From Swiss-Prot:
Acidic residues compositional bias, start-end: 502-524, 543-579
Listed Polar residues bias regions: 588-608
Species of origin: Drosophila melanogaster
This protein's name: Protein SHQ1 homolog
GO cellular component: cytoplasm; nucleoplasm
GO molecular function, one term: unfolded protein binding
Function as written in the Swiss-Prot or TrEMBL entry: Required for the quantitative accumulation of H/ACA ribonucleoproteins (RNPs).
Length: 608
């Protein structure tokens, strides 16, 4: 997809754009259905010839289909105009007034061979005189100053007859979100010169290898599950890119990316893809692949002609896109193709899925990295960069390895279910012929591609992907840090809690010992008082027994007195008094010893 520049001018609240028609390429295109394409071209020529004069009709009949073959996208500050084979981009410092845009008239000047579009702009205000993302005309100043500087550049360009001078001056390119652009092709009308009749824009764009193919696809060979564009000839390359970007944004999974961000989730028994070392200098071709290569080379009906620099750039970008998908599959399968290899090599390549055209290496890398973190099993940004490094090594000196892998991919597409033969027909076979031709793709040219790709890799970062990867990683890091704080807090509190539990156990053990000691002392005291009680009871019983004996003795004394024996009674009384006093003295001594023992026990208990 070629890029062109637009000359513009502001007049009050309107912006006039001058878009040159792209030159006719010398390279002929292949038509999937030549009869249908010829009929469409002849009908367009007849319609144009009815309105224009005979001389003008003869001059423009062959190119009227190319004049009408346009696709237009517009936003508040941006306009994308795809004319036949070339994309023109314009960023306005003024805001376009799209509220009442129902029909946009496009004038084509057959003499000067350019399109002219006039768009209304919103009035300038004090606070909104510059468009977002920078000013194409001035850079950094106020809106009036930027307008004066832009007018000065336009005056110089008009004086020197260089309408693209203002666009070629160094300015900061604004960041445009292409998926937000609105397609207004159906609202546009084309007017040739000053004729009153207007025409609708048509859609008949090229696709495939170097955009050489046109017409409808053979749907029987199309894998609808992988290929998202079934009518590439009806969609311009910018529309195909927009479809791809929107699909990737819908299918991108934040959680899946988080899972593979810190460490790849490699199944057990498989090698980590980041540790794989491809052997690009050790390759061999099977007999079946050699036979396939021979047949593909014989299918070439005409010699490879040197194409212009724009087509060459598109071919090289397509080759790099195919190679990146192959490198990912080889690295993730350890160069042992699986049943999913055909799907992997097709889903990671926008050429197969959307028939997309690339004109610079940066877009190729960004598209591959976006799809790599969206669709396959391993979705890791660093893994994608490693695949790019593998592709660089292949371009440096792995031509045989590349041819072998292209043939293997051809076999996988042909034998897959559903069939992916359309990818072989429109891309792979032409690229196999291109790589195997030393005149079309020399070793020096491949080394130049490797150097350019290496330089671009250093400039591409995660912000270029446009999927919020940096924000997702920051969010994940915060979550991991929060979990680490929680784990550290739980681990820090558990030893303290364990130490506290040990102290509590020690206290419980000490209190238990104290309880046991107290219980022993209490038992000693209780036993002492129990023994004292028993002794007192014994003393009382002895006293009772003595009283009974005294009563009996009194009775006997009475009998003796009756007999007149008084001396013996006195002697017995003295003996009883002596025995009772001795008994009382011994009992008191025993009681005192028990009390002393109790007091000693209490003293010992209080001391402990």
């Amino acid at each position: 997809m070629l890029n062109g520049q637009i000359a513009h001018s502001y007049l009050e609240n309107s912006c006039t754009l001058i878009i040159p028609r792209p030159p006719v390429l010398n390279q002929s295109s292949k038509s999937a259905q030549p009869a249908a394409a010829a009929a469409a071209s002849s009908s367009a020529g007849e319609e144009f010839g009815q309105e224009a004069g005979s001389g003008l009709a003869e001059a423009e009949a062959l190119h009227v289909d190319r004049i009408r073959n346009c696709d237009i996208f517009v936003d508040a500050h941006d306009l994308y105009f795809y004319a036949d084979v070339k994309l023109y981009k314009f960023h306005s410092r003024r805001t376009f007034d799209l509220r009442e845009l129902k029909t946009l008239l496009i004038k084509f000047n057959t003499t000067e061979n350019h399109y002219q579009i006039c768009l209304r702009c919103l009035p300038l205000t004090a606070g909104a005189q510059e468009g977002p993302g920078g000013e194409r005309g001035g850079g950094g100043g106020t809106g009036d100053a930027a307008k004066q500087w832009n007018s000065r550049k336009e005056y110089i360009a008009a004086f020197l007859h260089l309408p693209t001078l203002s666009a070629n001056l160094p300015d900061k390119q604004p960041l445009v979100q292409e998926w937000k652009l609105k397609r207004i092709t159906d609202q546009c009308q084309l007017q040739l010169d000053d004729h009153e009749r207007t025409y609708k824009l048509t859609n008949n764009f090229g696709y495939g290898y170097a955009s050489e193919y046109s017409g409808p696809l053979d749907l029987s060979e199309l894998d609808r599950a992988t290929c998202r564009v079934s009518e590439p000839h009806r969609m311009s390359p910018i529309q195909r890119r927009q479809e791809r970007v929107v699909d990737e944004m819908k299918r991108f999974s934040r959680e899946q990316y988080k899972i593979n961000f810190v460490e790849l989730q490699v199944p057990s028994g498989h090698q980590n893809p980041l540790r794989y070392k491809p052997k690009i200098y050790e390759t061999s071709m099977t007999q079946e692949q050699a036979h396939l290569l021979h047949n593909i080379s014989r299918m070439q009906t005409r010699e490879q002609q040197p194409c212009d620099v724009f087509r060459q750039n598109e071919i090289d970008c397509g080759l790099i896109s195919i190679l990146l998908a192959i490198c990912y599959d080889v690295r993730t399968t350890n160069n042992e193709p699986t049943c999913e290899s055909g799907w992997t090599r097709s889903i990671l390549c926008p050429l197969y899925c959307y028939f997309e055209q690339f004109d610079n290496y940066r877009d190729v890398l960004v598209a591959f990295l976006r799809r790599m973190i969206t669709y396959p099993l391993y979705r890791n940004f660093e893994l994608g960069r490693q695949c790019v490094r593998d592709a660089i090594e292949v371009l440096k000196g792995g031509r045989n390895w590349l041819i072998n892998q292209l043939l293997l991919t051809h076999q996988q597409f042909a034998s897959s279910d559903p069939s992916r033969d359309s990818f072989n027909n429109y891309y792979l076979e032409d690229y196999i012929r291109y790589v195997t031709s030393p005149s079309a793709c020399s070793d020096e040219h491949m080394r130049l591609l490797a150097r350019n790709l290496k330089n671009v890799l250093m400039d591409v970062n995660k912000q270029h992907l446009g999927l919020g990867v940096t924000e997702i990683e920051t969010e994940l890091i915060k979550e991991l840090m929060q979990e680490m704080r929680i784990d550290a807090g739980s681990q820090g509190s558990s030893p303290q809690q364990q130490h506290g539990d040990d102290d509590l156990d020690l206290d419980n053990d000490t209190s238990g010992q104290e309880d046991e000691t107290t219980t022993d002392d209490e038992s000693v005291i209780t036993d002492s008082f129990y023994s004292v009680d028993m002794d007192m009871r014994l003393i009382e019983n002895e006293i009772v027994y003595e009283d009974d004996e005294e009563d009996e003795d009194d009775d006997e004394d009475g009998d003796d007195d009756e007999d007149g024996d008084g001396d013996e009674d006195e002697d017995e009384d003295e003996d009883e008094d002596d025995s009772s006093s001795s008994t009382t003295t011994s009992s008191e001594a025993e009681g005192n010893s028990v009390i002393e023992q109790c007091s000693n026990s209490e003293t010992a208990a209080s001391t402990t």
